[in-house]
């Protein structure tokens, strides 16, 4: 019984040390996000905004608000 307990403790310590050795997502290199507003000739729609931002900036397109002529492109700087 004591051998089994010792084995479980050793395995638990090994797994815990492996998790502690992994780099954390917070402490690593931070990815900076940029936003560009693109003025459109007509009200923004997701079907127009998303491909435009993907092609120009390799990012995501958002239409802030209703009946707005602005497409907001969010991408990694």
Curated annotation (Swiss-Prot):
Disulfide bonds join 34-77, 44-63, 49-71, 53-73. Keywords: Antimicrobial, Disulfide bond, Fungicide, Plant defense, Secreted, Signal. GO terms for cellular component: extracellular region. It is found in: Secreted. GO terms for biological process: defense response to fungus; killing of cells of another organism. Pfam families: SLR1-BP. Residues 1-27 form the signal peptide. Belongs to the DEFL family. This is Putative defensin-like protein 162. It comes from Arabidopsis thaliana (Mouse-ear cress). The gene is LCR37.
């Amino acid at each position: 019984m004591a051998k089994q307990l010792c084995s479980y403790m050793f395995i638990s310590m090994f797994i815990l040390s492996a998790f502690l050795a992994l780099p954390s997502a917070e402490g690593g290199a931070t990815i900076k996000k940029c936003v560009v507003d693109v003025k459109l000739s007509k009200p923004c729609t997701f079907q127009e905004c998303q491909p435009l931002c993907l092609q120009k900036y390799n990012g995501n397109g958002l239409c802030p608000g209703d009946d707005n002529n602005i497409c907001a492109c969010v991408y990694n700087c």
